[in-house]
Amino acid sequence: MSITYMNMFMAFTISLLGLLMYRSHMMSSLLCLEGMMLSLFVMMTMAILNTHLTLASMIPIILLVFAACEAALGLSLLVMVSTTYGMDYVQNLNLLQC
């Protein structure tokens, strides 16, 4: 395993740990999710380029499309929650009450 793969795997792991540990605010959770998606994109792109899979070259772009949709939905949810409740604490939200 090369040093670049190890760095990207470490970035994914740190983002996952950040998502699990610092989940009090919705904005920090969204930033950790974006870090995970970015590291997955880089790892997938490097793997496809190293193995010369030309048919799978669209997969990282599709992943970026899903990441952009996830970011847009997350930010719209953040705006809705912060205007409705006046805070972005994830712990105080209960979606079953809506």
UniProtKB/Swiss-Prot annotation:
Q: Which GO terms describe its biological process?
A: ATP synthesis coupled electron transport
Q: Which residues cross the membrane?
A: 1-21, 29-49, 61-81
Reactions this protein catalyses = a ubiquinone + NADH + 5 H(+)(in) = a ubiquinol + NAD(+) + 4 H(+)(out)
User: Where primarily located?
Assistant: mitochondrion
Q: Which Gene Ontology terms cover its molecular function?
A: NADH dehydrogenase (ubiquinone) activity
Its Enzyme Commission number(s) read: 7.1.1.2
Please provide the record's keywords in A-Z order: Electron transport, Membrane, Mitochondrion, Mitochondrion inner membrane, NAD, Respiratory chain, Translocase, Transmembrane, Transmembrane helix, Transport, Ubiquinone
Q: Give the record's membrane topology.
A: Multi-pass membrane protein
Q: Which family does it belong to?
A: Belongs to the complex I subunit 4L family.
Q: What's the protein called, per UniProt?
A: NADH-ubiquinone oxidoreductase chain 4L
Record organism: Mesophylla macconnelli
